[in-house]
């Protein structure tokens, strides 16, 4: 049924990441799908303005840290190496996730979400944005 499952994760949110990965892994095992784990490092205009001169250094350090943590996560997933991949990108989580889903031709996105609170109702959440803008099916795991 599914060939490629995209699992966007926030490696700093261990509980959400774990729930989404477990769910996606169950689906991948049942369907023979490949998993692609994606971590998006958001770029806030405040960070860019505050550190404009050292932006590349900050970006490089964040990438190295994320690469290490994401690699450890992928290594812990019990799936053959040819069925799991990962990537890191910079930008708006919603835009990067929907763009990556298109690029890898994902037929399912599995994303973790917290229970909504007043902030997410007023401002929206990454999960809500992905559900709204993705061209493929999205499974939100709570």
What are these language model-derived features?
Residues 53-56, 104-105, 127-129:
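Short, hinge-like loop/turn segments at secondary-structure boundaries
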Residues 111-133:
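Glycine-rich, Arg-bearing micro-motifs that act as flexible, cationic patches
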Residues 75-109, 116:
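Structural beta-alpha unit
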Residues 3-51:
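Small/aliphatic-rich secondary-structure junction motif
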Residues 9, 112-114, 142:
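Short secondary-structure boundary segments
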Residues 36-38, 85-89, 139:
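General small-molecule cofactor/ligand-binding pocket signal
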Residues 40-68:
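Acidic, proline/glycine-rich short linear motifs
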């Amino acid at each position: 049924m599914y060939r490629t499952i995209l699992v966007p994760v926030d490696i700093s949110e261990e509980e959400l990441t774990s729930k989404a990965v477990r769910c996606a892994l169950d689906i991948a095992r049942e369907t023979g799908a490949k998993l692609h784990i994606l971590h998006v490092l958001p770029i806030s205009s405040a960070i860019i303005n505050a550190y404009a001169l050292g932006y590349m250094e900050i970006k490089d350090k964040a990438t190295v840290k994320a690469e290490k943590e994401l690699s450890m996560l992928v290594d812990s997933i019990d799936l053959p190496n040819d069925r799991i991949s990962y990537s890191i990108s910079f930008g708006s989580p919603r835009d990067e996730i929907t763009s990556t889903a298109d690029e890898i031709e994902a037929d399912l996105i599995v994303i973790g979400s917290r229970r909504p609170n007043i902030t997410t109702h007023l401002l929206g959440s990454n999960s809500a944005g992905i559900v709204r803008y993705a061209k493929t099916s999205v499974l939100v795991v709570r």
